Amino acid sequence: MKTDMRYRMLGRTGLMVSEIGLGAEWLERHSAEEVKAVVDRCEEAGINILDCWMPEPKVRSNIGAAIRGRRERWIIQGHLGATWQNGQYVRTREMKWVKEAFADLLARLETDYIDLGMLHFVDEVREFHQVMEGEFYAYAAELKAQGVIRHIGMSTHNPEVAALAAKSGKIEMLLFSVNPAFDMLPASEDMTEYFREDYGEGLGGIAPERAQLYSLCEQLGVGMTVMKGYAGGRLFSAESSPFKTALTPVQCIHYALTRPAVASILAGFDTPEHVDSAVAYETATEEEKDYASVLAKAPAHAYYGQCTYCGHCAPCPKGIDIAMVNKLCDLAKMQPEVPAALRAHYEGLSANGGDCISCKSCEERCPFGVPVSEKMREAHRLFEGAGR
């Protein structure tokens, strides 16, 4: 079947992946028939990579049924450490649960191998070392030696962890969060500089550690697949976007795919029509893809009071990663209910909004006037309430 889909090499794995992929998380709330409709439309469009991190049994079985008889057409990203315990998602490094959950993934997807075996959700440097130096990585290496997983990857939202993984020589590819809101920060202390008409040229406002990560991965042959490319839908609305101007799916996709090392953006699809709106990227004009001019023309006041996750507020005396807490809170507010993965991410932080002592030293450093201590209380109320 001829499609307009383009394919890219996923780093040194040797795998050619569609530049738009299926991030299957949204399928969790759908019936088997609805899941099959989305998967079928993806296949018709030339999509050949899917990520299934979710341990929930029903969605795994529904995806397995949808790809039945066509398994070899799909490159599957499956996760080690995402488990289902007492009716809910639990991220764990306890090997009993890890092994059971991975066996369940194979059974429900009706396959005897996973193309990309992901060390799931490693966001802190200390945890990275524990994972890589202990039985967790050893288990992944054993599965690879047996041919049960073909390549070892890691999912992380932290550029420092991602860089360590890339340099380790043991991680072949990364699943990493990429979008303009996560990447950009003020280019200078002078806010008017950031909103110059030619700001978008060269995108000088990307956080240095993230720009360095993309270049590092390109140099080392560590391919990237992208999660959170739409920032949970937040970027599609001028009201909810930190830029106060709306971006389209095509613009978000183009942003991700123009980062070095990125091979595929894994978008979430609720319906076949959502697939179509993403795949429209393949035939879009340069004007339709242009995100830089949209961001450059954002009103100069757009950021005021809005967290852009730039990190200028650090350091926090209690060790709170303020940008991460705000990011998780903003993503959670985009959903009718707080997703289990976001709640687990929040609970896994070494310090969270509940640890804020309202010293407000961060607020003095914030270039956008964000009421940080208030945001920390809001985040903690949101996630604590979701956990009950």
Name these PLM-found stretches.
Residues 1-78, 112, 139, 145:
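N-terminal binding-site loop/beta-alpha segment at the start of enzyme catalytic domains
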Residues 10, 22, 42, 50, ...:
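Conserved, mostly hydrophobic/aromatic
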Residues 21-33, 80-99, 129, 237-246:
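Active-site mouth loops of central-metabolism enzymes
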Residues 27-33, 51-61, 83-85, 92-93, ...:
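Acidic-and-aromatic substrate-binding clefts and catalytic sites of carbohydrate-active enzymes
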Residues 29-42, 93-110, 156-164, 247-255:
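Short, acidic/polar
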Residues 104-127:
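Active-site groove signature of glycoside hydrolases
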Residues 334-361, 385-388:
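Short Fe-S-cluster ligation motifs
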